[in-house]
Amino acid sequence: CHRPDIDTPIEETVRAMHNLIVQGKVLYWGTSEWSAQQLTEAYAVARAHDLTPPTMEQPEYNLFRREKVEAEFLPLYDLFGLGTTIWSPLASGILTGKYNNGIPADSRIALPGYEWLKARLESETGKQQLEQVKKLAKLADEIGLPIHHLALLWCNANPHVSTVILGASKLSQLKDNLKALDSKSKMTPEVLEKIEAIVQNKPEGPARFGQ
């Protein structure tokens, strides 16, 4: 269920998904960008009426967007066995380093309809992130990785991440991204600590539901 529908009761959504499973049309169902509060309600409804709850949530997760996966959802992993299928691991391409020296003419941000992304990149926060990307690129180079592999492996190192969605637009990009798995051993505790020292944005703890 892609994005919560505030006009539809969660019980109705859970029943609809359960019926699809009973009919054999789908095997499982999940959510995307739901809050911890909405997920908790979905599980409560499923348990109360003997229905099938969602088995996964699809949140945005990368080195610059960490709150949901690392804080808000933290109580849900053990409580419900929730898994996450995360999207935008490269932060819309920012973590590839291709925007470090400006916006390439053939990049996504240069396309019509992506003015919002350009504005975000050119904001003060965006400028700070680009400086962090440069430092991350230096670290990646020191351990023999391209920066986008570093960013992907960082996501994969989180035990609460079940699947990393690769937003590749070309077959060559997909093959290259998958090669990151050959370097999993390079994501050591020491490297993770160095990454934290660069981004300095680790969530402090579980957030309140809905925040």
Regions found by a protein language model. Give the residues of each.
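Histidine-centered active-site/metal-ligand motif
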Residues: 2
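Beta/alpha (TIM)-barrel catalytic core signal, keyed to glycine-rich beta->alpha loops juxtaposed to Asp/Glu
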Residues: 5, 10-197
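Short secondary-structure junctions and interdomain/linker hinges
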Residues: 143, 202-206
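Short, hydrophobic secondary-structure boundary micro-motifs
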Residues: 164, 206-208
